[in-house]
Amino acid sequence: MKTMQFAPTRRSFMTGIGAFGLSLGAFGVDLAPQDAFKGKIAGRRLKIAAIGCGGMGRGATESLISAGCDLVAICDIDPSMFDYWEKKYPGIPKFTDYRKMLKAMGDKFEAVQVGTPDHTHAYISIDCMNAGKHVYVQKPLARTVEECELMLKTSLRTRRVVQMGNQGHPGVWRYKALRDAGVWGEIKEIYSWSDRPIWPQGMKEYAKPEPVPSHFAPDSWDCWCGPSADHGYSSAYHRFKWRGWWDYGCGAIGDMAVHNADPAFWTFALGLPTKVQADTFGEGPVGVAYPKKSRIEMDFAANQWIPNGIKLVWTDGGIKPDMKSIAGLEAYAADYAAAEEARKAKKAKKAGKPYTPPAKVDPLVPGNGLIIVGTKATTIGGSHAAHPVCIAGDKAAVAAAIAKGDAASKYSHYREFVEACLANDLEKCGSKLSYAAPLTEALLIGCVALRYPGEALAFDAKKMCFSNNTAANAFLKAPKRGAWDFARL
């Protein structure tokens, strides 16, 4: 396979951030909070259309409306998703093919919310950018590295704003404050994990095709598949269960590392890994689906924040950091477990139900989190850049720095997008494309490693390819199927 030809986009991006963090504006570190934008767009609301309006798409659309958007049209391949919106907005225009919506109503809206499965994020987003629309797209940004690069290239060419939906991103200001205060000391290790998957994974073969639901339009399933392979309609794919399949989702790491590891990537300008290695705990390479549980180690090159480089360890499927190997974690886990039991007792009492506490409460590490181990302090935080706490080191210094970060974090994830679109400023959003693309790419490189458990894959960020496994490079490429070819966009 030929080397991926993404270097011009990547080089221009790397130049813009000063080679991994020497000027961190492009990573969002020095972004002004929302107050800096006030007064520029008073009274102006953004007109949007929703593509994928159930599940996360529904939640994101409602949040965008609350943040200053007017919803003018909705689109979903599954018409059963329309009922909710019809009750709220009687007579709102409805479509089952976003391309028909663009053609019929493209002059009626300025931006789109893309809340479809992972494998169609990039194609729909690029098509909409080419049609002049700003894009709010769910996480992960795309399913392959090439798709992320194509999105970045299209945004720069069309000057359309793109924001990725990692909704907890405003919380990274706390981590910036911790970094700037120097309370961690030198960063030694980073751990991030999730209790996902909560959907099927580990399948050995594709699902047996079922009849397409009678309420679907004739081309609805084709639209659902988009550029990815059509394995026939099945309830094992639609709805929700698509996440566990290689061709349609990004597994647990794609679903949750975008949230849980976000503060580490942003705060330390990690960029792309130089080496990745995965462990699937004896499951071996799975042909059609992600493994049930995994551990992925990612090595990142040195920069001004991590002068000796760093290893980030991601785990999922119930695999959590070892309590005994991280200072302070076992004591924290004991307190967390006790608090969980107290919460259960309170909930039972409120419901008027009896509650019998266990004879012994074992230490419990939360289901999702991020641990940053430094020479001076260690912190643990929850999902979506949740409030970190000190588990080892100077707790007062950590608390003071976090309070400073809280004071700086005054903006809304969704309002940022609205104001960026109205100002036509690609860099106003915290989770803007120049940050979201490399973040997602790093995780997708980890996804590829899951196909080669036990093998250390070296990644060349300049050439955007694996340097020691040519076959693995095929999984970095964007798919194409019939008319759904990125080359036509």
Regions found by a protein language model. Give the residues of each.
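N-terminal secretory signal peptides and thylakoid transit peptides that target proteins
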Residues: 2-21
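C-terminal helix-rich "cap/oligomerization" subdomain common to oxidoreductases
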Residues: 15-42, 289, 420-489
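N-terminal Rossmann-like dinucleotide-binding module
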Residues: 17-89, 168, 264
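Hydrophobic residues in well-ordered beta-strands that form the structural core
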Residues: 50, 114, 137, 162-164, ...
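Conserved acidic residues
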Residues: 72, 110, 188
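Beta-loop-alpha module in the N-terminal Rossmann-like domain of NAD(P)-dependent dehydrogenases
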Residues: 92-150
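A contiguous active-site-proximal alpha/beta segment in oxidoreductase catalytic domains
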Residues: 134, 142-218, 222-223
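Glycine-rich, aromatic-lined ligand/substrate-binding cores of catalytic
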Residues: 217-415, 419-425, 429, 439-448, ...
